[in-house]
């Protein structure tokens, strides 16, 4: 008893749920050059559009801040006010720097391309990415753990190595790609291949491909309907992602004045997450398909109006800051920075010169760097750059490779067993796979009963995120049906952590046992 008491003042491992899976069977005038596939923009307009992309994205993030994941599987009613006012961007900048994660992760990649050149290798991008100092979650953190432990891309984003592979992580950080490839959508998808497979694959990768295409094409298209339909051509037909967005286009045609009916159709058919253990069989849904569909809804029903489009995307719920951010960014490109209403733009200007958390990048710097990268990409693609204008070599979209995660694999039940353990945990299940969802929790300064109460109510993740520098690494031996399958490391340090202690897919169908044995429970 004394040993156990002494131990509990140090560390405990909380496994909250196991999910078992088995297989079943200012609108700018873009002038085409006569007789060619070139579009002309003045340099001033090009830079205005790039600025509009970054500004619109950041505005959307802040607008959705108070409702981010507050409405899961439900619309945000019109009666629920979403505030915006002078000083509001700076308020959130000071209150919650992590809110801007989809902007500063974007900027991290901008910095990588700036430091190492436009031909930077996937491996170099991954190394740069994995050694960032800020908090990450879902597919981003899973890939960072993989890379730090020797699993390099594309394996780092592959679903068997990353249960979050279909999550929207790449979708919310692909904006920069379209901004550096104006009108050159196939160059955008090539960069998306290099970057997006670091953290995602399948539908999760397609989310970023789709977003980068939207941004790229917004430089040369003024019609949101044409924009969405053309960007969708980058996604292979027959994939779930393509089918989902195609449904949104279809429902917009059926209900052209009723976005809420289209939203309900979307919920009925597509609101089901098969991969992310935080969302399976729960209302939380961070899957790239449905969140990209909310982006499409905002663009299609917003009719190019910044305020209406951003508002619709936010009121779809779920990731209600990132989705309006994408919509705001795309329309910022289409119409330009100078066309964003002052109501939205003035509060943003207060933070434009400030560096984002854990970066040396500000919006003001991003405006200049992305403009420079766009000019360099234009030169590489055979575009023409004159003193006052550029000729953009417009590209018809070519679909990227076919990928589909979790084929013939889907969740069948979620078993919540609130339990902490200090040495060994054993679990029996029927199926062909499982995933444990829980966190390593340090008890040195927190009463264990309090940890148990909070974990049972809201999960243990809040405790798992609280250790920015703890060097302790738990070591687990994982036995499947009595045979050692893997030894895994679970770092306490936030930026090094493994999100899920263990998972396994595509076992032989039947009855199985998984046992976790903690090899070093007392780090002192």
Model-derived features: where do they sit?
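Bacterial N-terminal signal peptides that target proteins for export
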Residues: 2-12
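C-terminal motif of bacterial Sec signal peptides marking the signal peptidase cleavage site
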Residues: 22-24
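Accessory "access/gating" subregions that flank catalytic or transport cores
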Residues: 41, 147, 156-165, 176-184, ...
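Active-site cavity-forming subdomains of large catalytic enzyme subunits
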Residues: 47, 51, 55, 59, ...
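Catalytic phosphate/nucleotide-handling subdomain of diverse soluble enzymes
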Residues: 59, 63, 70, 74-83, ...
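Active-site-surrounding "flap" and adjacent substrate/cofactor-binding loops of secreted or lumenal enzymes
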Residues: 66-97, 103-106, 123-137
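Glycan-recognition and processing domains
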Residues: 387-473
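Beta-strand-rich ligand-recognition modules
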Residues: 457-524
